[in-house]
């Protein structure tokens, strides 16, 4: 298989992942309206996936065994990467508008480039700097006016850093070369344990919900924490963490379109300019 075909597959996988993630705010708002909290959604997203993947691995007869080195890498990636990202991003929604929090979270391509530069000696190319500049302009445009605290801004930005850690750790430790279903299972398992432990102190996970809410949580889990996550893992494997993180910028654009079409959100000048800036960013980045 030629390098061009491999790269195209990587771009498609990552773009599909970003689009699926971008659809999640619509489903999340519906579930919250039925009595769930942000931490409830975070918990059941990974809890459901852990159970489903356990039986999938059993049926496919995939070995559960992990080498000690891989076990440590998966634990660190889950607890301080994907798990911590879900927790602190959801917590930031309690302090700032969700639009601002999500926009600040999308500083993570910058953090990915910085982490790869400082810890792995990768050079930041001129094209990446130009592309990232447009992306930052787009993110700033997406930031709607609203009240918020500095602590909320800090949490949202920190979630971008932890997500960057997740992407880089998967790429540089070779975790993406592991069976995708097996990796997703262990990431979900450790994140479930992490959120459950935190809830022992916070008591914020709601269990008294109707059947529809539980059904929607299952759909959310299978689409976001399973399908989109596996697609992203394959995208990182084929593209590397830096390229993949830029393609993920399709997510806020998707969220904006979904908000306008289904949530009655207005198409403001800032949103339009933000979407255009991110599209330009992607065109520059993808241009050979």
Ranges and model annotations:
Residues 31, 41, 45, 92, ...:
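Hydrophobic/aromatic residues within transmembrane alpha-helices
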Residues 33-84, 111-112, 162-169, 184-203, ...:
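Transmembrane alpha-helices of multi-pass small-molecule transport proteins
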Residues 16-23, 27, 56, 73-95, ...:
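Hydrophobic alpha-helical transmembrane segments of multi-pass membrane transport proteins
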Residues 53, 115, 124-143, 160, ...:
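Hydrophobic transmembrane alpha-helices of multi-pass small-molecule transport proteins
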Residues 1-40, 44, 146-172, 193:
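Glycine-/small-residue-enriched transmembrane alpha-helix faces in small-molecule transporters
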Residues 40-42, 46-50, 89-123, 159, ...:
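Specific alpha-helical transmembrane segments that line the substrate/conduction pathway
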Residues 7, 46, 55-58, 130, ...:
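C-terminal-most transmembrane helix of multi-pass membrane proteins
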Residues 22-23, 47-51, 136, 189-193, ...:
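Small-residue-rich packing faces within the transmembrane alpha-helices of Major Facilitator Superfamily
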